[in-house]
Swiss-Prot record:
The keyword ATP-binding applies. Belongs to the heat shock protein 70 family. It comes from the Bacteria. It comes from Pseudomonas syringae pv. tomato (strain ATCC BAA-871 / DC3000). GO terms for molecular function: ATP binding; ATP hydrolysis activity; ATP-dependent protein folding chaperone; unfolded protein binding. Chaperone involved in the maturation of iron-sulfur cluster-containing proteins. Has a low intrinsic ATPase activity which is markedly stimulated by HscB. Keywords: ATP-binding, Chaperone, Nucleotide-binding. NCBIfam families: HscA (TIGR01991), PRK05183.1 (NF003520). GO terms for biological process: iron-sulfur cluster assembly. This is Chaperone protein HscA homolog. SUPFAM superfamilies: Actin-like ATPase domain, Heat shock protein 70kD (HSP70), C-terminal subdomain, Heat shock protein 70kD (HSP70), peptide-binding domain.
Amino acid sequence: MALLQIAEPGLSPQPHQRRLAVGIDLGTTNSLVAAVRSGLSEPLADAEGQVILPSAVRYHADRVEVGQAAKAAASQDPFNTVLSVKRLMGRGLSDVKQLGEQLPYRFVGGESHMPFIDTVQGAKSPVEVSADILKVLRQRAEAALGGELVGAVITVPAYFDDSQRQATKDAAKLAGLNVLRLLNEPTAAAVAYGLDQKAEGVIAIYDLGGGTFDISILRLTGGVFEVLATGGDTALGGDDFDHAIASWIVADAGLSADLDPSAQRSLLQAACSAKEALTDAEFVEVTHGEWRGTLTRDALNALIEPMIARSLKACRRAVRDTGIELEEVEAVVMVGGSTRVPRVREAVAELFGRQPLTQIDPDQVVAIGAAIQADTLAGNKRDGGELLLLDVIPLSLGLETMGGLMEKVIPRNTTIPVARGQEFTTYKDGQTAMKIHVLQGERELVSDCRSLARFELRGIPPMVAGAAKIRVTFQVDADGLLSVSAREMGSGIESSIQVKPSYGLTDDEVTRMLKDSFEYAGDDKVARVLREHQVDAERLLEAVQGALDADGERLLDEEERLVINLQMDELRELMQGTDGYAIEQQTKRLSQVTDAFAARRLDSTVKAALAGRNLNEIEE
């Protein structure tokens, strides 16, 4: 029978053919793509021969501009030009407000939701902006390699948390890229230098990019990396050097610190140019508007020394955490364009007592290492004749719970093969069957997800609500085929299904579902909370009504019954509305006014059970 292929759309079903895969360094300041060709990993250039793609996106009414042209227009069109979007990945609006003065954008969105940047094309999320950068890199790679890509290894800072990593994966999906793996930037750098081919040793990776700093201490044993310690700062990088120089210009020129976005962009560009010039020169003439001044390398060193000291402090802490001495570090790899600054290299050499490795362009080293890893994961390198392949689930898999809610069992981008189980229970007393509704999607409500299959588990022993334990297991095999089983743990009865709808998902459908999950995330969260409160209220109302029918006249006086009925009526009325908080509070009030009734029922049940029995019988 034809079974549903839960796999990335567009991939070849023939895994043993030569596959085109790339490594991508999605950086704060610059991005680039690399690939292994003729056995060598090298960055891929655009039509003009440029390898580096500035991580800048400018939105026009009818088109999107990415790269150098967008970066150059930043000061003239600051509201529609997005720089350093990596700093916003996976963060809420309240988080990015802490960077307020450094980000001359107009943000829209709720405090706890994804920040959207208001542009002439409408609101753009950081995921969408990053996707526009990745799309250009994908197109560049396909043009250079002469075919479609089967996947990419994308690097991220070791410090990125789960939400930032997920945002990176989502951006790749929107750009039409299959993510083979997210690789920590320090590990990619070590691979680029071939340090994974050494027999053993301790290696430090000092990664100072445009917006983040990472330090990783790795131990290599028998060609296998063991991460001994990591550290760093998600808000420390070359951008901060630029801001320090910009502050110096403002102070020296006697300018107002309250600059409009265009002037702020222009100031930062002047600061960045000065920093880059001082890599080779001892001094540089700086111009901003009508002001002109001279910045020396010594003055620059003084400005950035506090930031360098922060990075060295993190290095010492990371080494201390490993329990080894600084002298035991055998190699120090420099990563990130900001490590070109002479004082940075000097400080690192002084700390570790050895010259760092700088032979590979620090802007390219991460992408080069990622490309080597991508070539392996795509199956182009053989180890003992076996292909190393990796695939992931493109959209989350789950099932429907009470209230029409989607409960995710296997999150999207989980590597397959995989099996995950979760326990559920019955909703009503005496329930002997359970309907299992299998879903696919990222939204909170069943109505917004894709229905895959339905089946029933029958023969559940009748018992009070919540007593039965039903374990539902989702299993996706190496070919992406999904099977779902449900088992009542007490009796052992089981039912299962293999999902077999008549069609799969296209790329456009996956993209639409992902974009909808971003766009409606806030509304979905509110709707889910409301449904959860309504389900809790309904469960309590049914329990109280059942208790009243059974024991109300016997254990309650007329006034007590009246109070309980009034509270129940008020809760039923609130459940018709959309105020989740009010429903929650009224549910608590109803629970409180029925506490005494519940205690009396318990006492009555215990007395009835003990009636006519002596102590010896009870002890037996």
